[in-house]
Amino acid sequence: MSVSQVTDASFKQEVINNNLPVLVDFWAPWCGPCRMVSPVVDEIAEEYESSIKVVKINTDDNPTIAAEYGIRSIPTLMIFKAGERVDTVIGAVPKSTLASTLNKYIS
């Protein structure tokens, strides 16, 4: 499963109303650490394709959702399950850290 881009308009449908846990990558094109974590997010999407959905949202183009979730630094990775935010990882973290965080929410 590839990583989908979501917008302020599609966030509710793609993330909140999703039956699977969803990993949301809040990022911006000018953000160096975002570019560092992007391949990790892509790998997670491939490895967990049957268990989770992975989406990215550009905070510059979609400020409403970023503000709603209090995004103050990027990259911020949030995990949603059953429409609720259940965890947040801030910064460019190693794949192992992200994977262990995700594993807590995969049934």
UniProtKB/Swiss-Prot annotation:
Q: Which cysteines are joined by disulfide bonds?
A: 31-34
According to UniProt, where does the site described as Contributes to redox potential value lie? 32-33
User: Is Chloroplast there in the keyword field?
Assistant: yes
Which residues catalyse the reaction?
31, 34
Q: What is its main location?
A: plastid
Which subcellular locations apply to this protein? Plastid, Chloroplast
Q: What is a single cellular component term in the Gene Ontology annotation?
A: chloroplast
| Family affiliation | Belongs to the thioredoxin family.
Name of the protein this chain belongs to = Thioredoxin
Organism of origin is Pyropia yezoensis
Query: Taxonomically, what lineage is the organism?
Result: Eukaryota, Rhodophyta, Bangiophyceae, Bangiales, Bangiaceae
Gene name? trxA
